[in-house]
Regions:
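Surface-exposed, flexible loop/turn segments at secondary-structure boundaries
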Residues: 86, 146, 203
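Active-site rim segments in enzyme catalytic domains, especially the processed small/beta chain
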Residues: 42-58, 62-69, 76
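Flexible, polar/acidic helix-loop-strand segments at domain edges
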Residues: 13, 63-130
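Extended, hydrophobic/aromatic-rich amphipathic alpha-helical segments that build helical scaffolds
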Residues: 16, 75, 79, 124-161, ...
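Long, intrinsically disordered, low-complexity segments
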Residues: 3-53, 120, 125, 162, ...
Length: 249
């Protein structure tokens, strides 16, 4: 959890970050400064934190109970990734579960004036972490058949991740590798791309869950971006004529 605090930006576990600076951004001047509004998006509305650490936001992107439950007993990443707020401490919004993302949550003192406070948080976005290096290596070796490099053992890499989280070692099976990435990177924007890369998106991103007001379908062709119409027009009638990806219109 400490890695996501302001004083630990650019620490040894964080290889590359997008630096966010609260420099007076406002609704009328969105290009002023480099503050981020992500903390406002994902924090519960009208939050009253008894400990005075976290602030309220707009209440988007609540965490599902299944994500909270996927962590093993004693896994420090659960409470470092998810805030669980009691009823009465915030105003429920769409798809409310009482669970919210913690890593980039709105924190007291992270959005000083001037400018609009919701647009000026200084939470740096961690783009690439050491943990991703380890789990990428494990996946390449165990799921994609690549040879180990310079004697670096895939099991040992996975053990590093698990030891830091305070849980026992597990075997680097495909199922375990996928689950470990989900646990490690919750709330960091990795999950969608992992599912697409593994070919799991059509299954796991297609659902009909009235409890979450979620009805959606994901098909294989959707992993490709649509080609802009203007670009296709430029090549029309040539030997290099562009054709639209999938069923994009």
């Amino acid at each position: 959890d400490a890695m996501w605090e302001d004083e630990n930006e650019f620490c040894k576990e964080s290889i590359f970050e997008s630096n966010q600076l609260p420099e007076g951004k406002s609704w009328g001047n969105a290009w002023s400064g480099y503050g981020t509004n992500l903390p406002a998006f994902i924090s519960p509305a009208d939050l009253k934190d008894p400990d005075g650490i976290f602030k309220g936001g707009w209440g988007f992107g609540p965490v599902r109970q299944a994500a909270y439950d996927m962590y093993e007993q004693g896994d420090k990443r659960r409470d470092g990734s998810i805030n669980k707020w009691d009823d009465g401490l915030y105003t429920p919004r769409f798809q409310n579960t009482g669970l919210f993302q913690r890593k980039y949550a709105a924190r007291v003192g992270y959005n000083p004036p001037p400018g609009d406070v919701d647009l000026n948080y200084c939470n740096n976005l961690r783009i690439f972490r050491y943990a991703e290096t380890l789990l990428n290596y494990v996946e390449l070796v165990k799921m994609h058949g690549q040879s180990e490099v310079d004697g670096v053992n895939a099991q040992a890499c996975l053990d590093q991740i698990r030891e830091r989280a305070g849980v026992s070692p597990i075997q680097p099976t495909e199922e375990n590798i996928k689950l470990e990435r989900r646990r490690e990177f919750l709330g960091e924007g990795m999950r969608f791309w992992d599912l697409v890369r593994w070919g799991d998106a059509p299954t796991l991103l297609t659902e009909n869950e009235p409890a979450h007001n979620s009805v959606r379908t994901f098909e294989e062709w959707m992993k490709y971006l649509p080609i802009p119409q203007g670009e296709m027009e430029k090549t029309k009638g040539t030997e290099f004529e562009l054709k639209q990806n999938g069923n994009w219109k």
